[in-house]
Every structure is written in structure tokens, then in C-alpha cells.
Amino acid sequence: MREVSQVINGKRVIVKKPELLAPAGNLEKLKVAILYGADAVFIGGKEFSLRSSASNFSLEDIQEAVEFAHTHHAAIHVTCNIILHEDNLKGLEEYLLKLDEIGVDAIIVADPYIMSLAKKLHLKLEVHVSTQLSTMNTSAIRFYENLGVDRVVFAREVDYQDLKEVREKVDIDLEYFIHGAMCIHYSGRCMLSNYFSRRDANRGGCSQSCRWYYDIFEKDQQLNHDEIVPFSMSSKDMSLVDELPK
């Protein structure tokens, strides 16, 4: 949430409004998002990010992004949200320290070790729990809060009623996706990409196999035919813009 000054019934008051966070795959898109009103932008670096299919940001790009964003009173969140394997540990500490030195406002993380390391290093930046951890209830949110995180990004599977109920019970910052892909396998807990294309979804290689078109068979009989729309496991995107006033 962010505080803004508004005139209501002839009086100037401070009200809280949700922060509008947008993704960006390169510097041009980042600048457009901020100039058109985004309060913050989340981006992926060359390492430790699930956004590996995007062009992504070098450390020099991230520094330029931070300088541009801060000039326009916006924030930069960097995704460090892969699930770490042993060969991903090398260079992680140095990378986090560099992001902090550059002035990044927050990192978005999914692996518990990155949460722990960020706190151990006493970084100035915030630590946000990624939607990849499928957080859906108050007890889980309090667990992460006790670990010292600053924000929890809800699982996209949470419906409006649960979102409203949880918001009333916890004080920590909450973030929720209102537009974009709806992962059919609970926020990336999926092995389809590994199986079909040998690309690890939880290390940034998701080939979006759930969006491919499939023919359905029962034994030798095809259940969908050419005149029917091909079957896809994830054919819809989220679109909650009309729900924002709530």
C-alpha cells in the first residue's frame, strides 16, 4: 500500500491506495510502464530469475533502471525466484550484495535459503515472498512474517473472498496478480516442461507446455475433433481490472 494526499469533502486527508506493480522485460518497457503510472516494476536479472525467456537485465541495466525509477518516484523489484540447485549457489551472495549496492528496492524470492541469506547479509532492500510458494492462508503468511520478510505475493489461485479475509487478519504487505498467466499447476509446481522439453520450470525454463494444444484420446478413440477447439490445460489469463474498486 502507498499513502497519497487527497481532498475529500473539502479536507485534505492521507489515504492508502494499492501499489500498481508491472513487469518489464527490458529497459524500454520499464520506462514506458513507469511513465504511464506504475508505482513499481519487477524485472529479472541474468541469473537467479524465472524470467529466463525475457531479454532480462544486466547489472548495468538494473542500475539504470533504479536511477530512472527513483527519479520518477517508482521502485524496482528484482526477481530472484528460482528454486536453487547446488550449481545455482555460486555467485548468489555477491549478486545480492550488488543489487543492494545498486539501490534495488526489493527482491522477490521463492527459495528459503535466499530469504535466509538476505537477512544474514543485513541488506537494506526488502524481501518479498514470490507467488511461486503458493501462499494461500494466514498461518503461512505469519510463518514468513516471522522469518522477517516484508511482503507476501499471494498464490494466483486465491479467490476474492479468501483474499479479503486474509487481508483483515494480517498486517504485512500483501500483493496479488490482477493480470497475466494463470498457472494451472499451482504456481509452477509442474514437471510438464521438464518432461516434454527438458526445460526446468522452477529454474526459469518453463516452456508453457500447459498452453500447447492437445488431442484427447480414450484408448483408440479421439474425443476432440478438428471442428472442436483443441484442448489446452491453461487457455485463460487472469483479468481482474474491473474488480480493482473492491
Where are these regions (language model features)?
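Conserved glycine-bearing catalytic or ligand-binding loops at nucleotide- and phosphate-handling centers
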Residues: R151
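Conserved nucleotide-cofactor-binding alpha/beta core module
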Residues: N137-S139
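Active-site pocket-lining/capping segments in soluble small-molecule metabolic enzymes
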Residues: R2-T135, F154, D162-K246
